[in-house]
Structures are given as C-alpha cells and as structure tokens.
C-alpha cells in the first residue's frame, strides 16, 4: 500500500493550486486525509454540487425529524427517492459521515473532525441531538437503508421508513 502524503506536502500543493489563504490551504490538506487526488477534487470543486445537495437533504431530514413533521417527512422521502440509486447510496454515506462528525462534536472532541463551512455550522448546532443513546441506532438505520437500496428495494418505501425511524430517534436522547 502507498503511504498517505503528509499534511505539509498537501498544504504546499494547495498553495501551488491557487489557494492564497494559509488557513484554507491547511484546512484543505487536512480534509484530503493524505490523498492527492482528493485534494485535487477539493481544489477543482468537482462533486461540490452533489455534496451540497446531499447536505441540504440531510439538513432537511434532521429539521423535519426534530420537529416531528411526519407528513413533510413523507414528502422528503419522495424527493430522496427521485435520486438515482448511486446518488441515494452516496447520500446515505454522507449522512453517516455527518452524524459521526456531529457525535464527535457532542463528545467534545471537534479537533478530530473533518467539517468546515456550513457543514460545521449546522453540525455544531445539531450535535446536542446526537448522543450515545441514538448514534448507533441511527447508523444502523442508514446501513439498513443502504443495503435495501443496493438490493433494488423500492426507494420510496425505503426512504419513508428511514425518515420516520430517524424522526423517532432524534427526539429521544
């Protein structure tokens, strides 16, 4: 296996790639996790649109879940079902990542997180609702939904069940 590249090297690469702010270059190097290709993706902005769409879908799900807006959650599930299967699975992976990051913020160890910008702002506010009692069941729901999507389950049914299950878990810490 090829070892990961050092943060200093990636930071220098980010600066060569056009990043002028030292803090932003350091942050991009950290987010790349030692992967030069990931740094190039971050620098080029490729995948930003889908990542933003996933983030907006996640925020919407969590806000509706917290407020117990069940009819709107069904509408959310129909919206999520319109995505392609790969986009649905990518959303679920991203949702798991954001929940884990929120849990780390809740646990008081933000320095090991990989959030920035509006993801960091949202997850900082959302962190109190992701605790030791609900993080594992939430991640289990995500894994179950992802497996069902991979097995060609009806996405409307899968996401409706997923959204309603998440709603029950977010309110009960």
Residue ranges and their predicted role:
Residues 1-94, 98-173:
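Charged, glycine-rich active-site and insertion segments that engage polyanionic ligands
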């Amino acid at each position: 296996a090829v070892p990961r590249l050092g943060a200093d090297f990636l930071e220098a690469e980010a600066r060569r790639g056009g990043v002028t702010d030292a803090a932003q270059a350091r942050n991009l190097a950290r987010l790349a996790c030692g992967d030069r290709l990931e740094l190039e993706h971050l620098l080029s902005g490729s995948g930003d649109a889908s990542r933003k769409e996933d983030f907006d879908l996640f925020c919407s799900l969590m806000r509706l879940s917290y407020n117990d807006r069940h009819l709107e959650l069904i509408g959310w599930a129909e919206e999520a079902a319109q995505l392609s299967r790969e986009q649905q699975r990518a959303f679920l992976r991203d949702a798991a990542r954001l929940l884990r990051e929120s849990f780390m913020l809740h646990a008081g160890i933000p320095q090991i997180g990989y959030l920035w910008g509006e993801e960091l702002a949202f997850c900082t506010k959302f962190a109190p609702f992701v605790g030791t009692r609900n993080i594992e069941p939430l991640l289990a729901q995500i894994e179950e939904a992802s497996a069902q999507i991979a097995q060609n389950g009806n996405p409307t049914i899968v996401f409706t069940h997923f959204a309603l299950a998440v709603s029950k878990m977010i309110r009960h810490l």
